[in-house]
Regions:
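Hydrophobic ligand-binding cavity/cleft-lining segments
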Residues: 1-47
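Catalytic helix-loop patch of NAD(P)-dependent Rossmann-fold dehydrogenases
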Residues: 257, 293-331
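Conserved Rossmann-fold NAD(P)-dependent oxidoreductase catalytic core, especially the SDR/UDP-sugar
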Residues: 252, 264-306
Length: 471
């Protein structure tokens, strides 16, 4: 039976390293994007999930092919070890042992051992599996090291209110916050809610994650228990209709309404519950700047022209009303978010993998991008870093012309064909959208991030893609 082993030492006490693995969403946090695994169901049998909990995972192996994994935790020894054993799944057997070894007072080694077997004995298949696990564990340990270095810094049992938690950004942000020791109050969008429902406890450990159905279009403002309201100190507003799709009048109205109205509703929620925020953070967009050919743009530039610029400008004005109940307010002007789970990469992944890649127009317009992992780290850092206030450009410091941007992606996916698509064809579908999103020319500088020495997880597009398709 093949055996995989991986060891890594961390400069942290053994109790801190072990306890990090107890966080409810640790698995979501450390699972590499390219493994395409999501948690379907947890069955916590005790307050310590690692002791005897069961979990069902779904792995997207290829288009339209999803593999189910059913695993249980066993052989738990507090502060020393635990195991995951596959009950059923795509391989014949799978047992993962996690061992924690105290090397000194402030140094701990994690030793992972996985014994597995496939239904068919093929050396190349075993080799492929071993290589894949090597990549995955290198990524896992980078995440663990980062989170341990930030863990429990000024959290004090504070709650973070998150709206839009099920979206692309929120679904990665919540596991990060959970792993760092924050408690989380998720406002779950529900247009049928009366806003009179009570809080639902998602975590069985000391109400670490709670959820509340929220209808921002209702006149009734939801109320939360005073003991939770007093602990709410941060807010992350990620609500808003997806801007992709044909820009009909009704679609554009929904884009505007979903942003302005939900932001007003959030403010009413905060004020009604007498919440005193330390920091409020809102998703904004680089669309604020409009299209500015060959001009470097930073947070000091004025809004541009066009539908997105106008909408974003109005949106930020609504966001700034939070200064009445928050010590700091941040408009996070987010660029093109790179993730295999959604957004641009998910849209183009299939044709690029099939060997057909390209770009629209002459390819000279700049694309301002950011890796999802960097974006969620920036959000968390903004909770406490007083240097971040007002507009903050959440983009990589290395924007690329679209022809270069898509060429790098094509090379990662080994695309054999790389073409230029005349803008005439997509313009036939939605010219305004094409001009404002696909062909918009902005060269945006993350001035505040650079000035305050934010260290990018992925400084270059090549590095970002390594963390999407596999390092």
């Amino acid at each position: 039976m093949p055996e995989f082993s991986f060891s890594k030492s961390f400069n942290f006490p053994i109790n801190q390293v072990f306890d990090w693995h107890k966080s409810d969403l640790a698995l979501e946090r450390i699972t590499p994007p390219w493994d395409n695994i999501k948690v379907v169901k947890r069955e916590p049998l005790t307050t310590n999930f690692l002791k005897d909990g069961k979990i069902i995972l779904e792995q997207n192996f290829m288009p339209l092919v999803n593999l189910k994994w059913r695993l249980s935790h066993q052989n738990y020894v507090e502060g020393k070890s635990f195991e995951d054993k596959m009950i059923s799944g795509p391989v014949k057997s799978w047992v993962h042992n996690h061992e924690f070894i105290q090397e000194s007072k402030n140094k701990t080694k994690i030793r992972d051992k996985i014994n597995f077997s496939h239904w068919i004995k093929i050396k190349k298949l075993d080799g492929f599996t071993l290589n894949s696990m090597e990549k995955s564990f290198r990524y896992r340990n980078k995440i663990i090291e980062h989170d341990l270095s930030k863990q429990y810094a000024n959290t004090n049992g504070y709650y973070v209110v998150v709206s839009g938690a099920s979206g692309l950004v929120g679904s990665d942000l919540v596991p990060l916050l959970n792993s760092l020791g924050y408690k989380i109050l998720i406002l779950k969008f529900d247009e049928n809610s009366t806003n009179l429902e009570t809080i639902q406890v998602k975590s069985i450990k000391n109400k670490e994650i709670v959820s509340l159905n929220w209808n921002p279009y209702s006149k009734v403002i939801p109320r939360i228990p005073k003991e939770i309201a007093e602990k709410v100190k941060f807010l992350v507003n990620l609500s808003g209709e997806n801007i992709l799709g044909v820009w009909t009048k009704s679609k554009k109205d929904l884009i505007v309404k979903s942003r302005l109205h939900t932001t007003r509703s959030l403010l009413s929620f905060i004020k009604t519950n007498s919440i005193e925020l330390k920091t409020s953070i809102h998703a904004s967009a680089t669309g604020f700047y409009g299209s500015n050919k060959d001009m470097k743009l930073d947070e000091n530039n004025s809004p541009g022209i066009g539908f997105l610029a106008k909408t974003t400008n109005e949106w930020e004005k609504e966001q700034n009303n939070f200064l009445s109940c928050s010590k700091r307010n941040i408009n996070l002007r987010i660029g093109t978010v790179l993730s295999s789970k959604g957004g641009l990469i998910k849209l183009i992944k299939a044709p690029f993998r099939l060997g057909l890649a390209g770009y629209v127009g002459n390819g000279n317009n700049y694309i301002n991008w950011i890796l999802l992992e960097d974006l969620i780290r920036i959000i968390e850092r903004s909770f406490h870093d007083k240097a971040f206030s007002g507009p903050v450009n959440a983009v990589s410091p290395t924007p690329l012309k679209s022809k270069d941007f898509f060429r790098v992606i094509a090379e990662k996916y080994n695309s054999k064909i790389f073409i230029s698509i005349p803008a005439f064809f997509p313009n036939l579908i939605s010219k305004e959208l094409v001009q404002e999103i696909i062909l918009s020319n902005q060269k945006i500088i993350p001035k505040k991030l650079l000035r305050n020495e934010y260290k990018f997880f992925a400084h270059t597009l090549d590095k970002a893609l390594d963390n999407i398709v596999g390092i």
